[in-house]
Amino acid sequence: MANNSREHLARDLFRRYEGNPILEAKDWPYPVNSVFNPAAIKLPDGTLLLARVEDLRGFSHLTLCKSKDGLSNWWIDDKPTMEADHESHEERWGLEDPRIVWLDEQGQFAITYVSFSEGGPLVSLAITKNFHTFARMGAMLPPEDKDACLFPRRFNGRFALIHRPIVQGEAHMWISMSPDLKHWGDHRVLMRTRHAFWDGQRIGLACQPIEIPEGWLIFYHGVRATVAGQIYRIGVALLDLEEPWKVLRRSPEWILGPRADYERIGDVSDVVFVTGATVNKESDLLYLYYGAADDKIAVAIANMSEIREYIMMCPEAED
């Protein structure tokens, strides 16, 4: 049943930064086709993005970008920061769609990303302390798999990974557990697509999990097929704080979708694809960084207090 007050709040949760798009191919210091789907993390001296960059052959790599305010005056690495090892079966056709978390226990950043292998897309892991050198840990799970990120801490001694395998042709979100970041098990479906809804064809994790007092905020993308093509929009769910395989609430409606021209026109039309987020605790602002129409980067801004209010207005998740 519709909830008018919740739907009004959902419609107005995010505002687009007036300087969008914040990064485009024309800003790059070397020739590229497109830039999109960045991982994001807030550091003491500003915001760091690890952007997906598609070269003129159609292969993707990752490039570092930095900004003091997370919005403007971006420094961009003058060469690819992470490139595929084309001699590796795992990374034969490029690296895509990274997410970043800080692992307190290890004192390092964990980057999950999509490697395009000979067997299809799969999820890989790299560890770094400085974003200059990277320890590539290899594939985490077999293909076909995408849209993955670790939680920043363990649960009962185990790491948790949200990811989106394709199982029997269906694209639901799963969660898996590991004692050591190498051996994964206890696989279970976390969230399913919803037939006839805006997220009825495919879903996948958006940015990294965000811890709030009520639980873990999980932003995710949903896809709906229309006669004119697919539409990628963003929703949100709330997971239990200590048992993140339990979904507490889930938004019935989308909260961010393609509306601006730069989101509706590009390499792939009608796409808002979030892969990174930062939270400013002093201003209570959430920045969602996203690929717009698969060829540029934009940011949407919301108040965390309103996000928390909204998710608690959403219905409890069905088992």
Question: Which stretches of residues belong to each language-model region?
Answer:
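Acidic-residue sensor for enzyme active/binding pockets
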Residues: 96
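Beta-rich carbohydrate-recognition and catalytic domains
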Residues: 1-93, 102-201, 210-270, 281-319
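C-terminal substrate/ligand-recognition segments
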Residues: 275, 279
